[in-house]
């Protein structure tokens, strides 16, 4: 696939006199060097980006970098590295996960238990069950969730119990695990939370059912898109994305006063195959809030519209690093011949994080 891509774009990239196989080799070597250099950066967020980009490459040659990053002093870098190994090598991910169940950071520890359950076969059940005795609620939830996925449904109650935990983060994490379990048995518990008094609980429950909503949920979703709370409105709009009958409800939200609600409505419509509201993506790339612009850039990676390449190039010219970072990852997600020359050009970008993500995605395209 990578060789075919180069054949298509070599003339455009200024390599007309070069053999395609040599071009592939040069781009790959340059990309690997960029990732290695980025991981040496003193700034933690750059190292974290390098680890995430290495995972996105899905390339075996970057396993040593990812293993090294699992021992980084920055928890986010360790987490991204572990998640990256999951994309590259099941055996390496399991080895790292077993070690990282003792990590100093609770979020990394619980992610390690979750990955142990997700990537392991029946042989990990005994290991995962041991974490049911952990003093950390997130560890116990990760273990219980993993066991439910392995068919031990009696542990579902251990994931449901934290929904009433006094610490909000524990409640939200429980909702997240229920969403990942995602079975028909779990959905009614999540739908029940649509009536919760706390907007945050409603928001997270809506996020958890995204892609799994049923027609029975539609009446309540129609109520929620009219709430004053913008976060609830935008999560409810996204939750409608797999219900084609919700199209008439979503179209008016494309004119909502909140940028994220508009974006969610346009994205939900796109996911259901509707061509309505496509102009919203370009509008929001000009929004005064960089958070909205970065979100708009990010979803273009999955949004198949005719003008996508032009819009991504627009986002890559943004003056905020978050927007440009989201845009380069979206270009990689888009993939194909159109992405290739854009990513090659970004190997010389002024921002190291942009160069790192371009490198990771190019390595993936060249596989």
Describe these PLM feature segments.
Residues 42-43, 73-74, 104-105, 135-136, ...:
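Short inter-helical turns and helix N-cap capping residues of alpha-solenoid HEAT/ARM repeat scaffolds
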Residues 13-56, 76:
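N-terminal leader/linker segments that initiate helical-solenoid repeat arrays
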Residues 27-38, 59-71, 90-102, 121-133, ...:
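Amphipathic alpha-helical scaffolding segments comprising HEAT/armadillo-like alpha-solenoid repeats
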Residues 53, 84-87, 115, 146, ...:
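Core register positions within helices of long alpha-helical scaffolds
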